[in-house]
């Protein structure tokens, strides 16, 4: 179960991160001595609920994905990419 998996993760320091998806919400937390990251949805997002008593609904937020790169100097690097057409601005306007 969950406790056994947590023990395995804790006992294997080479595990840099646990990556998963399909909760329709981008979530990141520490567990078993490593970072767990849930990718955002590719289709529709759920409203942010911080406990099980809050109403669960879907919301029309930008969808996206996580892009991971491994770098010998930095290790695992993650970028979030949102899908859609958004207005772009040049640096001179900022």
Q: Where do the language-model regions lie?
A:
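Active-site neighborhood of phospho(di)ester-bond hydrolases with catalytic His/Asp-centered motifs
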Residues: 14-24, 37-39
């Amino acid at each position: 179960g969950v406790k056994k998996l947590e023990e395995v993760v804790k006992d294997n320091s080479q595990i840099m991160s646990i990556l998963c998806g399909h909760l329709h919400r981008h979530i990141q937390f520490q567990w078993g001595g490593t970072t767990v990251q849930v990718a955002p949805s590719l289709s529709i997002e759920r409203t942010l609920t911080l406990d099980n008593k809050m109403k669960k609904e879907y919301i029309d937020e930008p969808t996206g994905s996580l892009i991971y790169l491994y770098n010998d100097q930095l290790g695992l690097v993650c970028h979030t990419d949102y899908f859609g057409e958004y207005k772009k601005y040049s640096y001179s306007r900022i």
